[in-house]
């Protein structure tokens, strides 16, 4: 656990952190620091902590209230561990809100088992399962990432525009993997593509030759891997390359990151993919450099935006009580109001303190829709000379 303290003044909180204007508050950052997507967590956490620091050091947040952060490990795949970590953040750390979790299953478990019963706001930067769009949340759950219902459509369009008319699909055997695989298959076949096979795989296995044999037998011009970049997914790629079953892949969001690039390099040349992102992410580079994290890493902009939106909603509400500020998330995220970009949080706080309106764009061009999730902007990638390269935005 890492804790960033930006003041030494002690504060006493009610359970759940529902103190309106205390001298300091704490926000929990609940991400999968261990598990199959662990390499994604540090830059996401760093980005969220950078936003908290920016707000706190401005001196403009709720009459000078200081913002502290504390980390919890959701492990990505262990629902019990995610719930226990969320419980600790609320009952022991007295947080006023939670940024997280990282993976969809852990997010759903932590929210439904802990956050919802305790009336706590959660904003996930990266949980994308379509199933989270319809959970009963009492207006407490939000996402700065879009649903995989949207990613499935984007993925289908990219493949067909690149004249890929048939694919095999394998997905990590959990809510995220199945939700994305099903959304993609529906969109791809509706547009005229053929899915030759759509099967799950388990993460953490030493050998994926059996799964790859089934995929190869079904055929397809490319292999779509709706898995994780630190477990499962690399094993599938390695087995496919070793056997010659596939040499071109399509990589969804949780398969894109430095660890994949470092491991396979130019063996993945010509492979395609997509991850939530917008041109605004380039504005995060300087913030990342100043705070020792990669500002353009997958889901880092969404991490910054999740923290920024939570704190700006508190400022708009004049309260750190989740039952109060939850009703202001849409107000600060969407038009009308002055557009707010990364690094402009002090400006936003001042506008809100003066009774004005803001339209927070942030690093991911976030716009909240119906169920409290981002409408969705994606960065399209291609592996060129062994490097994950941005080729456009959608």
Residue ranges and their predicted role:
Residues 10-18:
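Hydrophobic h-region of N-terminal signal peptides that target proteins for export
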Residues 4-8, 20-394:
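Extracytosolic ligand-binding ectodomains
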């Amino acid at each position: 656990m890492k804790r960033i303290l930006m003041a030494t003044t002690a504060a006493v909180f009610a359970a759940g952190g529902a103190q309106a204007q205390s001298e300091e508050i704490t926000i929990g950052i609940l991400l999968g620091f261990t598990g199959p997507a662990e390499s994604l967590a540090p830059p996401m956490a760093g980005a969220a902590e950078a936003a908290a620091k920016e707000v706190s050091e401005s001196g403009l947040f709720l009459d000078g209230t200081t913002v502290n952060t504390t980390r919890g490990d959701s492990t990505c795949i262990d629902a019990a561990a995610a719930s226990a970590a969320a419980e600790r953040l609320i009952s022991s750390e007295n947080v006023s809100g939670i940024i997280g979790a990282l993976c969809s299953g852990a997010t759903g478990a932590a929210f439904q088992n802990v956050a919802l019963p305790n009336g706590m706001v959660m904003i996930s930067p990266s949980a994308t399962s379509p199933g989270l769009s319809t959970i009963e949340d009492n207006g407490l759950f939000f996402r700065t990432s879009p649903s995989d219902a949207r990613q499935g459509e984007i993925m289908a369009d990219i493949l067909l525009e690149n004249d890929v008319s048939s694919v095999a699909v394998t997905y990590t055997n959990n809510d995220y993997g199945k939700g994305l695989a099903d959304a993609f298959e529906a969109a791809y076949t509706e547009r005229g593509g053929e899915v030759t096979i759509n099967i799950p795989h388990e993460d953490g296995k030493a050998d994926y030759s059996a799964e790859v044999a089934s995929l190869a037998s079904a055929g397809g011009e490319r292999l779509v891997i709706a898995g994780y970049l630190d477990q499962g997914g690399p094993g599938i790629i390695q087995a496919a390359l070793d056997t010659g079953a596939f040499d071109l892949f399509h990589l969804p969001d949780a398969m894109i990151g430095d660890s994949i690039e470092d491991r396979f390099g130019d063996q993945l040349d010509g492979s395609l993919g997509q991850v939530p992102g917008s041109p605004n992410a380039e504005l995060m580079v300087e913030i990342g450099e100043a705070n020792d994290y990669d500002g353009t890493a997958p889901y880092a902009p969404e991490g910054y935006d999740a923290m920024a939106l939570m704190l700006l909603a508190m400022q708009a509400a004049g309260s750190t009580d989740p039952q109060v500020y939850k009703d202001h998330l849409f107000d600060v995220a969407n038009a009308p109001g002055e557009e707010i970009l990364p690094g402009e949080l002090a400006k936003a706080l001042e506008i809100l303190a003066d009774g004005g309106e803001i339209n927070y764009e942030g690093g991911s061009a976030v716009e909240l829709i119906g169920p409290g999730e981002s409408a969705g902007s994606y960065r399209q990638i291609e592996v060129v000379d062994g490097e994950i390269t941005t080729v456009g935005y959608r």
